[in-house]
Amino acid sequence: MSVVVLGVGGGIAAYKACLLARLLSEVGHEVHVVPTRAALEFVGRPTWEALSGHPVHTEVFDDVPDVEHIRLAERADAIVVAPATADLLARLAGGHADDLLTTTVLATSAPVLLAPAMHTGMWQNAATVDNVATLRRHGLVVKAPATGRLTGRDSGPGRLPDPDEIAEFVDLLITVPECAAAMAQQDLAGKRVVISLGGTREAVSYTHLRAHETSLH
């Protein structure tokens, strides 16, 4: 069983993180939800605790004796932040550690996936573009948002990807983090990608096989 820390930013897409938490739990992950203060304005603490089966904290000082941010950082096999708001991207890019989520991300050695969601103008703003580049340079995986209907009548890039897509990406992040990072930086919309893990055998003659213990395509 893998331990997944699900960070939730304070955006309207926070409701999608409820389904993501359930999907991750259903496939066998131990999920710990860490919402920001703003996220609790969209989805309350009891909902997160019911979906994850674990207590939910937002501040470093909520559970001082257990040093929660270090405990989560060390136990996590992966951290996924969905939605990652423009504010969260800026704080993480700057190395801020002013709540439980940012301190956990800063302290972990586990792979981190950020799934941004915001208005198109905010996503394309030069400051956000620079922050995303900084985060990727620091080794965090930033998955580009989907394109479609946004809050209100606007449409464009900035939608949080479907929860099932993020859940599949989390599994990839845990098993093959390098591949996940490469895929996240490419526009794969409308393309089919096949990932094959495990041994392969290739016939080179009627009597000989070329065998590989592991393969990745």
Predicted features along the sequence, with ranges:
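Short, glycine-/small-residue-rich phosphate/pyrophosphate-handling segment
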Residues: P111-A146, P157-F169
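Short glycine-rich anion-binding loops that position phosphate/pyrophosphate groups of nucleotides
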Residues: G11-I12, A39, F61-D62, A84-L89, ...
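Short glycine/serine/threonine-rich phosphate/pyrophosphate-binding segments
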Residues: V8, I12-L19, D87-T102, E202-Y206
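Short internal beta-strands
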Residues: E30-A38, L114-P116
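Glycine-rich phosphate/pyrophosphate-binding loop and the adjoining helix
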Residues: A146-V194
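Glycine-rich oxoanion-binding loops at beta->alpha junctions
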Residues: P46, A50-R91
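Active-site and donor-binding regions of nucleotide-sugar-utilizing enzymes
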Residues: E68-R71, A76, T85-A127
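Conserved small/polar residues in nucleotide/adenosyl-binding loops
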Residues: T207-T214
